[in-house]
């Protein structure tokens, strides 16, 4: 129900409790325009109601007939009720002390980072830093991440994060396939690599014809492989000297990838110093909770020769218009949004927020602090090894950093039983061995409890920790010659922010440089930058979600799995499909999983030869990149003058490839912001020729409650929980990309057999390192749906469409709206055509984007899907007041352009060509421009009370790519 003013309620008699209930209160806070504003916007559009507008926008043939079937979540919960319900689920989880290891470790998140990064909307509501001038803070934090990884691995350059260690290793494999030994299709994986990594590698290798071989690391040089993956230290704890082996692999024409633990590299010789070509790994133990598997920031570092083949985003240093240092995303021509099927990867969303947390962990602790943590962890492992030896157990690895594998023989079951009684998890290596991995959170009491477990199994008395410590003068746990001697983290940023005061101010200085949703709307088309409500974010930091190991026993994760099951059913209801998997940890991975599922379906019918994927010319770049990774051949389908799929061309291509047609990938509403009228026909054409229909769910925010891909012909979709379902973008991740499928595809949803998770016997292999992907952020979407309920989720969709049409209507007299449906209406976004402006004034879409920064706005999506355009998506969360502020800015900019067109302003010396204007430029003694300082900085009156200052002038992209530098900048360069 709508909230009523208390004065009106007081006039009613009797005043009932029901009249005072506020279950819809959250929806009123999530949806920006109130009833009066919505009616005013509808009046502008010429509609009497939201329902009338929606009837005109969405084809009647695909409208949902029923209300969202959300079952127990159909009615909205208040924020307090939803938090209480989720708390009840969280309390069903059991937080044991987990020594399972296998790539995941408990960690302390420094409180200053928890409160001022993870819980700070200035960081978590920002978008990917494609607009560098308003992203300098997070770009610096990501540059710190790159410097940290490069220093610790001993390699030349690192990217700014990948999704998890397993997918990073798979990306390294395909990187070396592109650049390595042309006569070989073999990738060799040492047998002590993390099991989940091997499984993801196998999943990735099969569609692209790579043969994966496994065996002892010592045999790698004889494998005739283009690449070899080594684990350092190994999953069972061994620290091996790979120097001679690496030389032998190189001599045989292969390259070496090393999956390395960054904390271990503070005391071990880094891979780059003994010949590794690529290093990959996870930064989770640098202050990021385990979270039942994620999200965490993986890394990939390479030798200099491979830098232009790297996947993922790369922060580089350039100069701005005034010649001052500025940061930007470098070498973007590698990425899928430009290179499409020829991209180095399909990765779009990465793990920026988690990379920032990990980098700040290194900044806060510094090199000395990190090494102290590492030495302490290693010391605890050494004391444990000495203790279990006294009890008659034999560690099988003489060398170790933090992990020991203990031969427990016939007493193995007892060890696990006694550990469980003390709320301790150990790794189940085999029927005769257990694994124990230590971390920075391990205390003396924890060590004593562990020793007591083994003593109980041995029928003896545990030695005291103090006695062990006093009696162990030193430990030869590392191979001779592998102790690190080189310096790392020598840059000043890692050596000055070690007090909380300094760290707090550093974090504040960075966040102040950036423009995020906490300052203004971010109207990026195809990105859905909507409210990430605080109540949705709160559960992310609960220990009952954060401190759960992804491979913990099932009885300890009951609450997690109930929440996941409920969220899957919520998404089934929203999409109209039969089943959902939450394993894919980004939209790109959901796409990839969906295409693998389609291939598995065809193979199950004896049609594995079907490998042609039809993709409209207007598609997002991840579509062709994912199809290529899935082993499919991309065939482009033309679009007509209105941006719709050209039905005649589709029919011709479907007929031409009928024997080999695997799928079509379409986006709905389409990438040009319109509900195509003939989407059912598109689906029917593809089905008639033996193909499956993949509906990209990037624009699901225009469909929830109104239509559903599973009901109008789709067979499979991915969703973006970081768009439609309120997980924040985090400056470029995390995200979740669930894959949703029809009933005939449900049996092919992904498994992760290496860790004991088998969802479907015929399911595809794992697509992420953990069974449920980025599980710890799933409560965000659960909370959003629970607090909205069926009616309000539909209202949110309707309001998103209303807001977009209001902007399109108001701006149409000033900028042509490139595409529209019947009645001149759009879906949830609109494309403004700036190409005529370029012809008449020389002002480019880039100039307009930079000028918007002076008005306090992030630019809409530039030049997608059409070069020279801006795609605007306001979402339902923005109020009419904020929409009007954006509209006023765009109209004012159009007047500035008109001044150029009419000769009242110079074609070069005008506020657009020199935007954005920094405070330093505006307040300088000299002002060389024909326009005033006031016009530069305060072009509209509202900026007088709320002004955002870009910290740098326009970044020189070409200079940055010509002079690639991706490390922290010396302080002297800022002088």
Swiss-Prot record:
One of its GO terms (cellular component) is glycine cleavage complex. Keywords: Oxidoreductase, Pyridoxal phosphate. It catalyses: N(6)-[(R)-lipoyl]-L-lysyl-[glycine-cleavage complex H protein] + glycine + H(+) = N(6)-[(R)-S(8)-aminomethyldihydrolipoyl]-L-lysyl-[glycine-cleavage complex H protein] + CO2. Gene3D superfamilies: Aspartate Aminotransferase, domain 1, Type I PLP-dependent aspartate aminotransferase-like (Major domain). Its cofactor is pyridoxal 5'-phosphate. It holds the Pfam family GcvP2_C. The modification N6-(pyridoxal phosphate)lysine is found at residue 723. GO terms for biological process: glycine decarboxylation via glycine cleavage system. SUPFAM superfamilies: PLP-dependent transferases. The glycine cleavage system catalyzes the degradation of glycine. The P protein binds the alpha-amino group of glycine through its pyridoxal phosphate cofactor; CO(2) is released and the remaining methylamine moiety is then transferred to the lipoamide cofactor of the H protein. The glycine cleavage system is composed of four proteins: P, T, L and H. Belongs to the GcvP family. HAMAP family: GcvP. This is Glycine dehydrogenase (decarboxylating). It comes from Burkholderia ambifaria (strain ATCC BAA-244 / DSM 16087 / CCUG 44356 / LMG 19182 / AMMD) (Burkholderia cepacia (strain AMMD)).
